[in-house]
Amino acid sequence: MDCRLLNEKSRIFVNADPYFVSDYVNQHVGSHCIRLPKSGCPEASLNHSTFGSLDLCRISYGGSVRVTSPGLETCYHLQVLLKGHCLWRGYGLEHYFSPGELLLINPDDRADLTYSEDCEKFIVKLPSVVLDRACSESYWHKPSEGIRFTTRHNLQQLDGFINLLGLVCDEAEHTNSMPRVQEYYTGIIATKLLEMLSSNVSRETFSEGCPSFERVVQFIEDNLKQSISLERLAELALMSPRSLYTLFEKHAGTTPKNYIRNRKLECIRARLSDPNANVRSVTEMALDYGFFHTGRFAENYRSTFGELPSDTLRRRKMKWLDPEESLPPLP
C-alpha cells in the first residue's frame, strides 16, 4: 500500500530487538504480549508520534510475531495494513488482513494477531472519551454499553480517510502544531469514524431537548475551572435534576458528573501536551481544574487515557530535547 504515514522525524527504533519495541509500545500505544518464532533473529522498527489525544505509530517486527492482548480498556485501535498480511483471530473466526484493509479493535476486544515477516502497520490509538464526545456533539445516541465498531473495513470504501490520516501525520511531525489544530483534527477523525464505519451508534438526531442540552454543554465549556452544580445545570436546562440525568444519558451516554469530569481531564491533557503552555506542575494543573484529591485525579486520568499525567508532561518535555538524546538506546 503506497502512502506516507510518519517519516524519519518520528523514528524511535530501527533494526532493533522486538522485545525493546514491544516494551515501548506497551508504554505508549497499548498493552500486549509478543511471541517470537523459535528460529531467526527478527529486527523490528518503530515510528511514533503523539498528536493531541492521539498516539500515531508505524511498526514492523521483521518476523512472524504473534501479538496478544486481553483488551485495551480505555481506547480504540485503528490498524491499517501497509505491507504483508496479518492473521486476526476472534469470536471463533479468522481473517487475513492485507494492505488496504483496516482492523478496528474496540476497548474490550481481545486481540490475537500473527504478523507475516514483511508485515508493516500504521496504528492510531484513540481514547474512548474522544469518540464519546464526538457522538454527543453530533447529538447521536451512544448505547449504555459503549460504542462498538465492526472489526473489518476496506479503506477504498472510506472515501478520503487515508488522506486525512496523512494530514494528521504531517501535522504531528510539525514541531509548532497548535493544540487547537490538534483538537480540530482529532475531532474530525472521531466524527469520520462514527459516520463511515458500521457501529452500534444511532445517528438519528433527537429533536426534543437538543437546545437545552446545547445550552448546558456550552455553560460547562465556559466554566470548566469552576465548581458546577447539578442544580445550576438543571436550572439552565429548565428541567428537574432527574430529567437532567435522562438528557445526558440520551445525548452523551453518561451522567452529568462524568461528562464534566471527562471534559476537565481532556482540557488538562491538552495543556500538558501543549509545548507552548505554561505548566509548572501536574498538581497545580489538577487544582486549577478543581481536582483537590491528587491521587484520585491521577487514577481517573490513567483510567481515561491509559497513562499518568506525569507521563504526558514528561513526553512533552522530551520533544524539546535534542532528537538523538530523546531516543531510547538501541540494543
From Swiss-Prot:
GO terms of molecular function: DNA-binding transcription factor activity; sequence-specific DNA binding
Keyword hit for Ribosomal protein: no
GO BP annotation list: catabolic process; positive regulation of metabolic process
Top-level taxon in the UniProt lineage: Bacteria
Domain HTH araC/xylS-type: 214-315
DNA-binding region: 231-252, 282-305
Broad class of where this protein is predominantly found: cytoplasm
Alphabetized UniProt keyword annotations: Activator, Aromatic hydrocarbons catabolism, Cytoplasm, DNA-binding, Plasmid, Transcription, Transcription regulation
InterPro entries assigned: AraC-bd_2 (IPR035418), AraC_XylS_family_regulators (IPR050204), Homeodomain-like_sf (IPR009057), HTH_AraC (IPR018060), HTH_AraC-typ_CS (IPR018062)
Localisation: Cytoplasm
Role summary: Regulatory protein of the TOL plasmid xyl operons. XylS activates the xylXYZLTEGFJQKIH operon required for the degradation of toluene, m-xylene and p-xylene.
Protein name per UniProt: XylDLEGF operon transcriptional activator 3
